[in-house]
Curated annotation (Swiss-Prot):
Gene3D superfamilies attached to this UniProt entry: N-(1-d-carboxylethyl)-l-norvaline Dehydrogenase, domain 2, NAD(P)-binding Rossmann-like Domain
Source species, domain of life: Bacteria
Subcellular location: Cytoplasm
Protein name: Glycerol-3-phosphate dehydrogenase [NAD(P)+]
Protein family (similarity comment): Belongs to the NAD-dependent glycerol-3-phosphate dehydrogenase family.
Record has Transit peptide as a keyword: no
Gene: gpsA
Biological or metabolic pathway of the protein: Membrane lipid metabolism; glycerophospholipid metabolism
One function term, GO molecular function aspect: glycerol-3-phosphate dehydrogenase [NAD(P)+] activity
InterPro entries assigned to the protein according to its UniProt record, in alphabetical order: 6-PGluconate_DH-like_C_sf, 6PGD_dom2, G3P_DH_NAD-dep, G3P_DH_NAD-dep_C, G3P_DH_NAD-dep_N, NAD(P)-bd_dom_sf
Annotated residues for binding of sn-glycerol 3-phosphate: K110, G139, S141, K194, D247, S257, R258, N259
Sorted UniProt keywords: Cytoplasm, Lipid biosynthesis, Lipid metabolism, NAD, NADP, Nucleotide-binding, Oxidoreductase, Phospholipid biosynthesis, Phospholipid metabolism
Amino acid sequence: MIDSKQKIAVLGAGSWGTALAALVARHAYPTILWGRDVGVIQSIDIQRQNFRYLPSIMLPQTLRATTDLAAAVSGADWVLVAVPSYAFTETLRRLAPLLSTGVGVAWATKGFEPGSGRFLHEVAREILGGDAPLAVVTGPSFAKEVTLGLPTAVTVHGEYARFTQMVANAMHGPMFRAYTGNDVIGAELGGAMKNVLAVAIGVADGMQLGMNARAGLITRGLNEMLRLSAVIGARPETLMGLAGLGDLVLTCTGDLSRNRRLGFALGRGQSLSDAIREIGQVVESVQTSDEVMRQAEQHGVELPISEAVRAVLREEITPYAGMKALLAREQKPEYLDILFKANSSL
């Protein structure tokens, strides 16, 4: 049931933040969107469009926008953060002193903290303190399709069931399904790794390696998610759901995926700098590939596809050499016997 008195502040006026703010505003929640770009905020507040990130899509009249963070979160019942991973820590540090006691924070950011490789829930808990209700929103969702009202399903994971359900309720509607769970680690892992794996599938498509190669890479990429999840305390069923498999399939096959487009350009022989410049928005995989491999190396888990992507994005090897190395790997069983067993290590 919708609580019409519930005020929501959405932080981040990029494509995803705008899409989520428009979604909850259409569900009759008083919603204010915060962003740094004055031009973007003015276009939303006056013309009802985000001309930079979601051009030609009209936004609801009830959605307000501001560049004043304090004004955005004042009186908010909860906050939804939708900034790139590189801005996550800074945004929370600015947010923390402005929050009233008991105000929950959810985020739709995907990735790890750059530099440290920490999960975002670890960053949030450290900055916001031990009592703040926290949740992560993830799953297969292109911002443009959400804003157009096309059918979408996501999942919200958190340790506080009441807050998790509150976030899901605000998003859930006739064309947008929001499921719930309590595996924050698994939800964050899937959302981060799929960006890295999408680069590999994009490279294969750019090199015209065929649909068989695409399917094989997606499946083996899912295997890498499961291998890492087994040693960090995540549950395999989370990775087999919307947070893992669902997001992986969308990001690896959808032409709206920036990470897939990056890989496709590299597979066609374009330079990394030119490909990023043409995309024109943040491509999370460039940073996240380092953090995924940091996690893998810390836990002694082999992730050959992710490792190859990191090497390509560091420009240590060519995309062709990366694919050749993957195909030359020794034959082995498809799954380790302990992969789906609880409390096991790889």
